[in-house]
From Swiss-Prot:
Disulfide bonds join 189-207, 374-436, 475-533, 479-507. Glycans are attached at residues 237, 356, 375, 463. Changing residue 166 to T: In strain: Scott. The chain crosses the membrane at residues 562-582. This is Envelope glycoprotein C. Residues 583-591 are cytoplasmic. The keyword Transferase does not apply. Residues 1-561 are virion surface. It comes from Varicella-zoster virus (strain Dumas). Its main location: virion. Changing residue 184 to F: In strain: Scott. The gene is gC. Changing residue 154 to N: In strain: Scott.
């Protein structure tokens, strides 16, 4: 065995580095074995480094499906490793290219043995004496043997040079490269689910068209508001505007109004039943809403809808939330030809208005029915108010309660509940305290509770009398409220400005009330004069309390003169009679 000195050589690849250097005593068989191992490792690294990479998709390919897109002849095919291809060389990946029958397989695992060579393993087969034992780095390729390196082999003239980005997959081949992403257009809105907006408020629903790739699952939104630049499809250098939405698609906006069913309720939540859907917007020429005056007028008066030429911003603005604009809004991307819905987005909008609640008690007279009223005014949604009456004796029965609901022109509602309780002897005083309990259901989550207590005012019937005392007309009222009631005098159906009243005592039946008296001077005019005394200050629903007296000054004077004459005559006759009696007695005495 002779001592040989081998030159230094390196095998470099993406996965390993090998370096053999030194002077060793080896046999020819051992040297050939090492060379074969190095060749196998080199071929494996070349195969790994030339694997195909995912093919990037340009923005111009976004509107073309993967099944129909053709390669741009003006674009040079490039491999994933960014090498510049030789026009004569087909840049195909090792994983997907078909072997040339005239080329020997380059992989140790896949190449077929030469019939002229005995099928021996790499570890045991003997080298060909006709082949000089040279290293892999320095040996020259055999003209009869096809080059085994992807970087150095020449293409087969029978094979068409194709790029990795443009070649069509062979159905029979096991293709491993990634397919271009599938593109579809999607409508996306800022809001979603259920939105609760106050009554009469403005609500904006921003919605935009976006491009979605199925493979990358990413959104690509256009930077421009309506349209984007693209090359003219005829291939000229002139640029023009191209719509973001595909020409075979169009956008529709539908509205379904909600109607509340008063007979259905889930807990405190109101059941809203959908009405017939109405189309508010469409940018399709076949469905242009301008041709439908009724729908177009409704949309124009209640909404700000997108322009028919827009291709990106499909936002809708509700000018004023009310009963007519409450419901579900649906945006749909529709295929114009097949009518299939590509994508859709819905927003349910509800509205509410907080009510104003007042509770008042109705004043009554002793013996009349107690009454109280609970007024829940201007609320929304309808059928969202619950009223319950209670007193110190418990819940008040429904047979004493009367309810009434009124709807206003603007869609709001009012609810009036009245309770009437007959008086009983044991309830005359003090009067019962009546409580109104209100529950307003805004939606299935929020509600408001309100309660108020009212005590009816009970008044006894006043006793009013009138007469003349010492030349004055005197009016007396018994059992009237202190500081509330005052006297009003009328003479011959005309009010007079005369205030003269005083408290003379307390009411015998109820010490909370007093007795009062007022007087008015008589007139000296002849003829009958009517004096009336009215009690002012009682609730308007009470009947009037008054007393009337007629006085005639001339009749009073005539009556006085006749009486005076009669008295004078009687006095004279009496005097004469007395004189006659005295004279008679004197005559008798003298006799």
């Amino acid at each position: 065995m002779s001592k040989k000195t081998f030159p230094s050589f390196k095998f470099r690849g993406g996965c390993f580095n090998l370096l053999f250097k030194g002077s060793v005593d080896v046999s020819i068989k051992t040297r050939m074995k090492r060379i074969q191992i190095n060749l196998i490792l080199t071929i494996a690294c070349i195969q790994l480094s030339t694997e195909s990479q995912p093919t990037p998709v340009s923005i111009t390919e976004l509107y073309t499906s993967a099944a129909t897109r053709k390669p741009d002849p003006a674009v040079a095919p490039t491999s994933a490793a960014s090498r510049k291809p030789d026009p004569a060389v087909a840049p195909t990946s090792a994983a997907s290219r078909k072997p040339d029958p005239a080329v020997a397989p380059t992989s140790a695992a896949s190449r077929k043995p030469d019939p002229a060579v005995a099928p021996t393993s790499a570890a045991t087969r003997k080298p060909d004496p006709a082949v000089a034992p040279t290293s892999a780095a320095s040996r020259k390729p055999d003209p009869a043997v096809a080059p085994t390196s992807a970087a150095t082999r020449k293409p087969d003239p029978a094979v068409a040079p194709t790029s990795a980005a443009s070649r069509k997959p062979d159905p029979a081949a096991n293709t491993q490269h990634s397919q271009p992403p599938f593109l579809y257009e999607n409508i996306q809105c800022v809001h979603g689910g259920i939105q609760s907006i106050p009554y009469f408020h403005t609500f904006i629903m921003p919605c935009y068209m976006r491009l979605t790739t199925g493979q990358q699952a990413a959104f690509k939104q256009q930077q421009k508001t309506y349209e984007q630049y693209s090359l003219d499809p005829e291939g000229s250098n002139i640029t023009r505007w191209k719509s973001l939405i595909r020409p075979d698609l169009h956008i529709e906006v539908w509205f379904t109004r909600h109607l509340i069913d008063p007979h259905r309720q889930l807990g405190n939540a109101l059941i809203r039943m959908p009405d017939l859907p109405v189309m508010l917007y469409s940018n399709s020429a076949d469905l242009n809403l301008i041709n439908n005056p009724e729908i177009f007028t409704h949309a124009k008066e209640n909404y700000v809808i997108p322009d028919v030429k827009t291709t990106s911003d499909f936002s809708v603005t509700i000018l004023s939330m009310d009963a007519t604009t409450e419901g579900t809004y649906i945006w749909r991307v529709v295929n114009t030809k097949t009518k299939n819905v590509i994508s859709e987005h819905s927003i349910t909008v509800t509205t509410y208005y907080r009510p104003n609640i007042t509770v008042v008690g109705d004043p009554v007279l002793t013996g009349q029915t107690y009454a109280a009223y609970c007024n829940v005014s201007k609320y929304y949604p309808p059928h969202s108010v619950r009223v319950r009456w209670t007193s110190r004796f418990g819940n008040i029965g429904k047979n004493f309660i009367t309810d009434a609901i009124q709807e206003y022109a603007n869609g709001l509602f009012s609810y009036v509940s009245a309770v009437r309780i007959p008086q009983q002897k044991q309830m005359d005083y003090p009067p019962p305290a009546i409580q109104c309990n209100v529950l307003w259901i805004r939606d299935g989550v929020s509600n408001m509770k309100y309660s108020a207590v009212v005590t009816p005012d009970v008044y006894p019937f006043p006793n009013v009398s009138i007469g003349i005392i010492d030349g004055h007309i005197v009016c007396t009222a018994k059992c009237v409220p202190r500081g509330v009631v005052h006297f009003v005098w009328w003479v011959n159906d005309s009010p007079i400005n005369h205030e003269n009243s005083e408290i003379t005592g307390v009411c015998d039946q109820n010490k909370r009330f007093v007795n009062m008296q007022s007087s008015c001077p008589t007139s000296e005019l002849d003829g009958p004069i009517t004096y009336s005394c009215h009690l002012d200050g009682y609730p308007k629903k009470f009947p009037p309390f008054s007393a009337v007296y007629t006085y005639d000054a001339s009749t009073y004077a005539t009556t006085f003169s006749v009486v005076a004459v009669i008295i004078g005559v009687i006095s004279i006759l009496g005097t004469l009679g007395l004189i006659a009696v005295i004279a008679t007695l004197c005559i008798r005495c003298c006799s």
